[in-house]
Protein backbone atom coordinates (compact mmCIF):
# COMPACT_ATOMS: atom_id res chain seq x y z
CA UNK A 1 0.00 0.00 0.00
CA UNK A 2 1.27 3.45 -0.90
CA UNK A 3 2.17 5.92 1.77
CA UNK A 4 1.30 9.61 1.46
CA UNK A 5 4.11 12.06 2.15
CA UNK A 6 3.54 15.56 3.44
CA UNK A 7 5.71 18.61 3.08
CA UNK A 8 5.50 22.33 3.75
CA UNK A 9 6.94 25.35 1.98
CA UNK A 10 7.62 28.46 4.03
CA UNK A 11 7.02 31.71 2.21
CA UNK A 12 8.82 33.92 4.72
CA UNK A 13 6.28 36.72 4.81
CA UNK A 14 6.29 38.57 8.11
CA UNK A 15 4.74 41.78 9.41
CA UNK A 16 6.86 44.77 8.43
CA UNK A 17 8.61 46.20 11.47
CA UNK A 18 8.59 42.95 13.44
CA UNK A 19 11.96 42.11 14.96
CA UNK A 20 13.92 39.67 12.73
CA UNK A 21 14.92 37.50 15.70
CA UNK A 22 11.23 36.94 16.48
CA UNK A 23 10.57 36.09 12.84
CA UNK A 24 13.35 33.50 12.76
CA UNK A 25 12.24 32.05 16.09
CA UNK A 26 8.68 31.58 14.84
CA UNK A 27 9.87 30.01 11.58
CA UNK A 28 12.18 27.62 13.45
CA UNK A 29 9.37 26.74 15.86
CA UNK A 30 7.27 25.84 12.81
CA UNK A 31 9.93 23.42 11.52
CA UNK A 32 10.13 21.80 14.95
CA UNK A 33 6.35 21.46 15.07
CA UNK A 34 6.18 19.95 11.56
CA UNK A 35 8.88 17.45 12.53
CA UNK A 36 6.87 16.39 15.59
CA UNK A 37 3.73 16.04 13.45
CA UNK A 38 5.56 13.65 11.11
CA UNK A 39 5.88 15.85 8.03
CA UNK A 40 8.40 14.46 5.54
CA UNK A 41 9.84 17.67 4.09
CA UNK A 42 10.24 21.36 4.85
CA UNK A 43 11.26 23.86 2.16
CA UNK A 44 12.30 27.51 2.31
CA UNK A 45 13.77 29.77 -0.31
CA UNK A 46 16.17 32.64 -0.73
CA UNK A 47 14.53 36.05 -0.40
CA UNK A 48 16.21 39.44 -0.39
CA UNK A 49 13.25 41.76 0.12
CA UNK A 50 13.93 43.79 3.21
CA UNK A 51 11.44 43.91 6.00
CA UNK A 52 9.05 41.07 5.43
CA UNK A 53 11.04 38.33 3.65
CA UNK A 54 13.98 37.71 5.92
CA UNK A 55 15.61 34.45 4.76
CA UNK A 56 18.51 35.61 2.60
CA UNK A 57 20.32 32.28 3.02
CA UNK A 58 18.15 29.16 3.11
CA UNK A 59 21.23 27.06 3.87
CA UNK A 60 21.90 28.98 7.09
CA UNK A 61 18.26 28.84 8.13
CA UNK A 62 18.04 25.10 7.39
CA UNK A 63 21.25 24.43 9.35
CA UNK A 64 19.59 26.00 12.38
CA UNK A 65 16.40 24.04 11.67
CA UNK A 66 18.44 20.85 11.44
CA UNK A 67 19.67 21.35 14.99
CA UNK A 68 16.08 21.58 16.24
CA UNK A 69 14.57 18.71 14.24
CA UNK A 70 15.33 15.01 13.95
CA UNK A 71 13.68 13.39 10.97
CA UNK A 72 12.17 15.93 8.58
CA UNK A 73 14.08 16.55 5.33
CA UNK A 74 15.12 20.15 4.73
CA UNK A 75 15.05 21.64 1.24
CA UNK A 76 16.19 24.85 -0.37
CA UNK A 77 13.32 26.05 -2.47
CA UNK A 78 15.19 27.77 -4.03
CA UNK A 79 18.78 28.95 -4.02
CA UNK A 80 18.88 31.72 -6.63
CA UNK A 81 21.80 30.57 -8.78
CA UNK A 82 22.53 33.85 -10.63
CA UNK A 83 23.58 35.40 -7.31
CA UNK A 84 26.13 32.71 -6.36
CA UNK A 85 29.14 30.89 -7.75
CA UNK A 86 28.19 27.22 -8.34
CA UNK A 87 31.23 25.96 -6.41
CA UNK A 88 30.20 27.90 -3.30
CA UNK A 89 26.61 26.66 -3.55
CA UNK A 90 27.84 23.07 -3.84
CA UNK A 91 30.14 23.46 -0.84
CA UNK A 92 27.36 24.95 1.31
CA UNK A 93 24.93 22.19 0.35
CA UNK A 94 27.45 19.46 1.12
CA UNK A 95 28.09 21.03 4.51
CA UNK A 96 24.35 21.36 5.16
CA UNK A 97 23.82 17.72 4.23
CA UNK A 98 26.55 16.65 6.64
CA UNK A 99 25.23 18.89 9.42
CA UNK A 100 21.69 17.52 9.06
CA UNK A 101 22.67 13.87 8.85
CA UNK A 102 21.80 13.51 5.16
CA UNK A 103 18.47 15.34 5.32
CA UNK A 104 19.28 18.21 2.93
CA UNK A 105 17.52 18.52 -0.43
CA UNK A 106 18.84 20.95 -3.03
CA UNK A 107 16.49 23.10 -5.06
CA UNK A 108 17.68 25.87 -7.37
CA UNK A 109 16.17 28.43 -9.66
CA UNK A 110 16.69 31.78 -11.34
CA UNK A 111 15.32 33.86 -8.49
CA UNK A 112 13.70 37.19 -9.19
CA UNK A 113 14.49 38.38 -12.66
CA UNK A 114 15.15 42.08 -13.39
Question: Residue ranges of each PLM-predicted region?
Answer:
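N-terminal beta1-alpha1-beta2 module of alpha/beta enzyme domains
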Residues: 1-76
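Flexible, glycine-rich active-site loops centered on histidine and acidic residues
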Residues: 2-22, 83-114
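Conserved beta-strand edge residues that scaffold enzyme active sites
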Residues: 48, 79, 110-111
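Active-site nucleophile and cofactor-binding loops and adjacent substrate-binding regions
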Residues: 76-84
Amino acid sequence: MSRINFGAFLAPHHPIGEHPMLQFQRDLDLVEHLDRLGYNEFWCGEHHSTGWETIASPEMFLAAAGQRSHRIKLGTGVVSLPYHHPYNVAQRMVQLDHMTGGRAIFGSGPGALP
